[in-house]
Amino acid sequence: MVKSLLKGIGDTKKVEKFYDDWSKNYEQSLIDWNYKAPRQSVNILNKYIKIKPKYLLDLACGTGLFLEEYSKLYPQCICDGSDISKKIIDISKKKKIYRKLFKTSFEKKIKSNTQYDVVSLIGAMTYCEDHQLLLKLVFSYLKKNGCFIFTQRTDLWEKLNFDKLLRKNSYFKIAHISRPLNYLPKNKDFKSNVKIRIVLLNKI
């Protein structure tokens, strides 16, 4: 499992099976590894966002850990989610925190009639194969002045020259890029070696 987490990008069917197999222990694993990205992301969003969001789309939503933190600050927001794993989605459904849940990869177009104030992608950018396509899709989901918040691992940030990629994109302007933050500090393979940056983009 850890090797798959480190590797990230792979065949979507393998990623789906990986998360289906992990689903029963998913939340406990992240607790054990001191995973704080959802809370950290919400804090950054709350600090920099200029609107009171009415609609959120939570891509690669997992079991709703980001939404649980987000809802503490924005309890009236209507939230939809998507994930590639059916078993993960089944867990989210039981929590009854999402209006709609879509079983699909975040790199495929979601068929929703809602225009969102915020789109989130927390802890899953590792699996993105086409970043320009993703930005284009997110742009299409958002209202004018909408926000896209996501995390990216620092090792992939450097490998992909991610700063340049963001600055060259024609869909968003950068609102905030965090300093490197611990990702899974109590995971023996990640520790403090692999960190994340949290990025907030505003729709142009």
Give each language-model segment a name.
Residues 35-52:
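Conserved alpha-helix/loop element of class I SAM-dependent methyltransferases that forms part
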Residues 118-131:
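A short SAM/SAH-binding and catalytic strip from SAM-dependent methyltransferases
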